[in-house]
């Protein structure tokens, strides 16, 4: 087992539903610890920068618009195999395909408004965490 960190973003749709606490409880039950967190309204520049890898994809503009449509809750999570553990909690990107009991099955509205983001690899997690948090803001516990 490897101790890892991953980035998690509770997206505007889930924040609007007031389910941040319910989602955090799932993280904790799965053994993931919040080691950094911030609640904020993303600027267009922040959203475009974060999702720059998708810039040429047809859904890029809609994704950016959605991510700036309301506040988000951003957290770095730490735990054994955190990337996979978090992605398992999230479920499939399309909530219609997500297993019952996953965050997206329970809280997401559509493939676009899918409740949460999760890093897809340890390498990307490090990049994504550094995008939103200074090293001094991430504290193991």
Swiss-Prot record:
Residues holding ATP: 11, 59, 87, 93, 104, 114
GO biological process: CTP biosynthetic process; GTP biosynthetic process; UTP biosynthetic process
Pfam families hit by this protein: NDK
Keyword Magnesium (UniProt): yes
Chain's role: Major role in the synthesis of nucleoside triphosphates other than ATP. The ATP gamma phosphate is transferred to the NDP beta phosphate via a ping-pong mechanism, using a phosphorylated active-site intermediate.
Subunit and partners: Homotetramer.
Protein's name in the database: Nucleoside diphosphate kinase
Lineage, uppermost ranks: Bacteria, Pseudomonadati, Pseudomonadota, Gammaproteobacteria, Lysobacterales
Gene name in the database record: ndk
């Amino acid at each position: 087992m490897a101790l890892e960190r991953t980035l998690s973003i509770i997206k505007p749709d889930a924040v609007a539903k007031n389910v941040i606490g319910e989602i955090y409880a799932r993280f904790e039950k799965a053994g993931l610890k919040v080691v950094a967190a911030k609640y904020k309204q993303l600027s267009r520049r922040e959203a475009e920068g974060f999702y720059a890898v998708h810039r040429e994809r047809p859904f890029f503009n809609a994704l950016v618009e959605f991510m700036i449509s309301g506040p988000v809750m951003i957290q770095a999570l730490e735990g054994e195999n955190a990337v996979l553990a978090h992605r398992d909690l999230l479920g499939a990107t399309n909530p219609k395909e997500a297993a019952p009991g996953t965050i997206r099955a329970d809280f997401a509205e559509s493939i676009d408004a899918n409740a949460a983001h999760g890093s897809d690899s340890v390498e990307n997690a490090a990049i994504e965490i550094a995008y939103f948090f200074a090293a001094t803001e991430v504290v193991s516990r």
